[in-house]
Amino acid sequence: QRGFSGAPKYGATPTGYYLKKFVDGNCITTANNQTTTRHNWIVMRLAEVYLNYAEAMYNYYGNADEPGDFGMSANEAVNVLRNRPDIMMPEFQGNNGFEERYMRERMVELAFEGQRFWDVRRWKKGAEFFKNVDVADFKLDGNGNLILNRVTKTRQWDEKYNLYPIPQSEIQKNGNLKQNPNW
């Protein structure tokens, strides 16, 4: 049945996408097989350092081409990543649309590295990025054909989610500490 047993989707992803990034290629990944292997966890890559630098430069100077006193502009920092020999993507140029291009670049470059959650909150773009999510639902029809049904699910988002609430016990310890907005 094309690899589908009709069993519940235990451990499956609701989007239908699976992760290969940072996976040990020597692991055997077949149905009903669990594999464990030791590997180092990457906390920060040099790519993230360049992206953080680009964001800081753009936010400080308001100009993606301004190197300031640091010798590298926001565009140049992003282009270090885009010009890697194994990638060779078109360069970032100019200010027009830099923020949107940068946000996409960061999403793609750091995919599955645990940064998106924090990035979207720092940019205060949760309502734009997290309110709707596309979900893939796979089923077999009566003839054994795989049917894909894409559904957009709406989730709740409130601006207060950009900041965590401060525990009440901490506020009680320090009377000068104020709760984050709307908590």
Regions found by a protein language model. Give the residues of each.
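Acidic/polar-rich alpha-helix caps and helix-coil junctions
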Residues: 1-183
